Amino acid sequence: MFYYPNVLQRHTGCFATIWLAATRGSRLVKREYLRVNVVKTCEEILNYVLVRVQPPQPGLPRPRFSLYLSAQLQIGVIRVYSQQCQYLVEDIQHILERLHRAQLQIRIDMETELPSLLLPNHLAMMETLEDAPDPFFGMMSVDPRLPSPFDIPQIRHLLEAAIPERVEEIPPEVPTEPREPERIPVTVLPPEAITILEAEPIRMLEIEGERELPEVSRRELDLLIAEEEEAILLEIPRLPPPAPAEVEGIGEALGPEELRLTGWEPGALLMEVTPPEELRLPAPPSPERRPPVPPPPRRRRRRRLLFWDKETQISPEKFQEQLQTRAHCWECPMVQPPERTIRGPAELFRTPTLSGWLPPELLGLWTHCAQPPPKALRRELPEEAAAEEERRKIEVPSEIEVPREALEPSVPLMVSLEISLEAAEEEKSRISLIPPEERWAWPEVEAPEAPALPVVPELPEVPMEMPLVLPPELELLSLEAVHRAVALELQANREPDFSSLVSPLSPRRMAARVFYLLLVLSAQQILHVKQEKPYGRLLIQPGPRFH
């Protein structure tokens, strides 16, 4: 199983909440559930399963999930989505309840239209109508006469006064037309307004996949009733019926006369009434026939949660240990600056380009030619020693050749510098093959005496233009020297290239050193190196920071 810190780390990983919801590693709050974007998470899981995610660093393999991890993440997505749906249903129910409560508010203030329907306030009318304190002034044929507001009736006097008998007057019969049915007064409300309506129940949202319980069949009801009857029978034990042998023994003991049934006599009184067999109480059971006492019911164990995996989540200690070992990670390559990456000439000339750029045929020819056999080198050692002695003889000029070479320089100075550098390299290679004991005695014993050079007469200096030459010593080759040489070429209105800095006959170490310095200057944007075609002319141009 693969663990990725950037995927499963809590609060930082993209699948941390999904992983915790699937494994039940810790309790999640509502905010963490609602923070998950289910659609985007499903797309990311699908990209990881189908190996579409790019590696975190170039050169590393693409991350892929195991079957266990992908299954756990799918279960976690289902649980998170289910919890989000549950939160949505709860929020909707809460909103509906609050709306229902807002509709059930009872108004206790009187409406503005109701006071006009009531009887007029006489005291208020007296205060408003100062000119007519008696509101009933000028009104005639008022029956019954309303009391005056100035006379306060005595209730006790009214209660004690005798009520006069009223003679009923029979009005004459007058033919009347059939009247229309009386209309219901406005004060009577319709039954719909009086009837108390039940609150409409809140409908629950149907959840997909939820099934109702099946109806109980007749057979299942019979089985349940039979189980209840069996439980009742176990609680009240019945006596077994007497054996036929016991019944015969009882009959013989009583005799034939007692067994004979007596008829009913009217004069005889029934002193005792024996209950029938069905109503007789059962005799207490004997200790031999007592049923065994059932053992006390065993206490049910608490239901435990089922875990399919013994270890649902890796422990923090083991997780940290795996991170420290870095067994599943690649080490980050140490990138050195161009000033420190010094390659030897053998590596530079044996690897012309990347291996993927050249076809295999050309690459094989190049590697074959770039690696000379060691035997050929050993054979050339004595030949090179003889050539070196000849070069030393040639290098010692005579008194006549010195002014001639000074006036007519036929051989460029770079050739002589290259010859001296190659001689120095061969001297170093020969000295390195000698053991240290002999090397210490080498300058004392075999050091030849320096030959006496002839005195050269002084000649007047002839102003002449010297060719562009870099210092022959590798230690003196620096960025400033290469920069100065390129600047001189540009001042002379010439197009500098690599061959103008290093001649074709110069040693490989010098060419590699100058090429390395050019790369450093191009990285610093001081120079701009361009090559139009492979193995072609290497042009040098001033960069943005050239000054």
Curated annotation (Swiss-Prot):
The modification Phosphoserine is found at residue 148. The keyword Protein biosynthesis does not apply. It is found in: Nucleus; Chromosome; Chromosome, Centromere. It comes from the Eukaryota. One of its GO terms (molecular function) is chromatin binding. Residues 278-301 are annotated as: Disordered. Gene3D superfamilies: Structural maintenance of chromosome 1. Chain E. InterPro entries: Rad21/Rec8-like, Rad21/Rec8_C_eu, Rad21_Rec8_N, ScpA-like_C, WH_DNA-bd_sf. Belongs to the rad21 family. Required during meiosis for separation of sister chromatids and homologous chromosomes. Proteolytic cleavage of REC8 on chromosome arms by separin during anaphase I allows for homologous chromosome separation in meiosis I and cleavage of REC8 on centromeres during anaphase II allows for sister chromatid separation in meiosis II. Interacts (phosphorylated and unphosphorylated form) with SMC3. Interacts with SYCP3. Interacts (phosphorylated and unphosphorylated form) with SMC1B. Does not interact with SMC1A. Interacts with RAD51. Forms a complex with EWSR1, PRDM9, SYCP3 and SYCP1; complex formation is dependent of phosphorylated form of REC8 and requires PRDM9 bound to hotspot DNA; EWSR1 joins PRDM9 with the chromosomal axis through REC8. This is Meiotic recombination protein REC8 homolog. The gene is REC8.
